[in-house]
Design a protein with these regions (language model features):
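A short beta-strand submotif of the Rossmann-like class I SAM-dependent methyltransferase core
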Residues: 120-123
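Short conserved AdoMet
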Residues: 128, 145, 192-193
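Conserved helix-to-beta-strand junction in the class I
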Residues: 139-146
């Protein structure tokens, strides 16, 4: 059964907004390991302009800015992005970082072929249907310049939480108020259709631990 509606995603948006407001800087200030890796890949590819989707309070966006990239950071939580803007100002990075509240179920508010690289850490595996994920990746391809790189991470069906908690259909399960779309490998492959799939790297993060893939693909 492929069940997904706007109610779950809207509830998740409200949940994240409350979470960021109640726990400023909840992920700390150190960048994620995937962001550190991505910065090296982006630099080697000659990228200058980076779009981060699902930036949260901005630890990775700030890292990209520190590393010399110009960053456009989006998230559906205004609370998280406000923390990001304040930190960017205090670090002298305000000119390198712009923010926009955006729901990835809607088209990206960017022109065609306008960014060199896109990064999304655990954004695609949120409460998005398979159809919505495909639409988002098509739009990411649209805004990337030729030879642009897209790096994303997702929890996959080998994760200990897969198949447990509250089921919402379409491989989406909810734990502790947070809904996760666990990726099967064939979804990764289908999202790379028309791209060059450079790497699917398996890694673990946090307690449990969470089991994820870090996917790198390049727009032709």
């Amino acid at each position: 059964m492929q069940h997904h509606d706007g109610d779950l995603a809207d509830t998740q948006q409200e949940h994240w907004q409350r979470t960021y407001a109640a726990h400023p800087g909840m992920y700390g200030q150190e960048p994620s390991a995937p962001a550190v890796h991505a910065a090296g890949v982006f630099r080697a590819n000659g990228a200058k302009d980076v779009l981060e989707l699902g930036a949260g309070h901005g630890r990775d966006a700030l890292y990209f800015a520190h590393e010399g990239f110009t960053v456009q950071a989006t998230d559906f939580s205004a609370a998280g992005l406000e923390q990001l803007k304040n930190t960017a100002r205090s670090h002298g990075l305000a000119e390198r970082v712009t923010t926009a509240v955006h729901d990835v179920r809607e088209p990206l508010p960017l022109p065609d072929a306008s960014v060199d690289a896109v990064f999304a850490h655990m954004l695609l595996c949120m409460a998005l249907s398979t159809q919505e994920i495909h639409a988002l990746v098509r739009d990411i391809r649209r805004v990337l310049r030729p030879d642009g790189v897209f790096i994303y991470t997702v929890r996959h069906t080998g994760d200990a939480h897969y198949g447990t908690g509250t089921p919402h259909g379409d491989d989406i399960y909810e734990h502790g108020g947070f809904a996760v779309h666990f990726f099967p490998r064939h979804l990764v492959d289908s999202l790379a259709d028309g791209w060059t799939l450079n790497e699917v790297h398996t890694f673990e993060e946090g307690e449990l631990p969470r089991r994820l893939w870090r996917v790198t693909q390049t727009r032709p």
